[in-house]
């Protein structure tokens, strides 16, 4: 019973936090700014960017396999980043940070967002995607907003 109550409380806090940031607009701090232009509501396909942030390689079609030794030896990082950059280039510059945040939102942190240093590292990787792709200034997500 106590566990059920805690789960309900966590769900309430998560939905309240999500609504708080959804109502206030995006966190797009690239050079062009958010301005008065609206970004599309549908989420763009940034699957490779999610894989890059999560340090995943796809070795078989639609079957994610994480190979840390292969990743750090450069076996697939470059290829995944290039695909991510190609996908990011299809998004308007003022919408890129919101799109990146939207794609990784909820994907980080393991159980109930608890992941320690790994989550921080993944958020940092997500924030620097635009500069890694030579597409402008890094994104800045709100501090303490770790999904």
Swiss-Prot record:
Tell me where it mainly resides.
membrane
Q: Which tissues express it? A: Found in endosperm and aleurone layer of developing kernels, but not in the embryo.
Which first-to-last residue range defines the signal peptide?
1-19
The record's GO CC annotations read: extracellular region; membrane
Q: Per UniProt, what is one Pfam family of this protein?
A: Tryp_alpha_amyl
Example GO molecular function term? Answer: serine-type endopeptidase inhibitor activity
A GO BP term here is:
defense response to bacterium
Q: Which residues form the propeptide?
A: 20-28
Processing after translation: Five disulfide bonds are present.
Keywords (A to Z) from UniProt: Antibiotic, Antimicrobial, Disulfide bond, Membrane, Plant defense, Secreted, Signal, Toxin
What is the annotated localization of this protein? Membrane; Secreted, Extracellular space
Role noted for this protein: Acts as a membranotoxin, probably through its antibacterial and antifungal activities, contributing to the defense mechanism of the plant against predators. Forms monovalent cation-selective ion channels in membranes. Contributes to grain texture and hardness.
- Which protein are we looking at? Hordoindoline-B2
Report the source organism.
Answer: Hordeum vulgare (Barley)
């Amino acid at each position: 019973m106590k566990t059920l109550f805690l789960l309900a409380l966590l769900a309430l806090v998560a939905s309240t936090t999500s609504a708080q940031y959804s109502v206030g607009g995006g966190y797009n701090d690239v050079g062009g700014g958010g301005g008065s232009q609206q970004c599309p509501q549908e989420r763009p396909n940034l699957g490779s960017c999610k894989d890059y942030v999560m340090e995943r390689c796809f070795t078989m079609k639609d079957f994610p396999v994480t190979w840390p030794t292969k990743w750090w030896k450069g076996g697939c990082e470059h290829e995944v980043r290039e695909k991510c950059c190609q996908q990011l280039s299809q998004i308007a510059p003022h919408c890129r940070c919101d799109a990146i945040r939207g794609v990784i939102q909820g994907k980080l942190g393991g159980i109930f967002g608890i992941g320690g240093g790994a989550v921080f590292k993944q958020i940092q990787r997500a924030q620097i995607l635009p500069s890694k792709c030579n597409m402008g200034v890094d994104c800045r997500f709100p501090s303490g907003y770790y999904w």
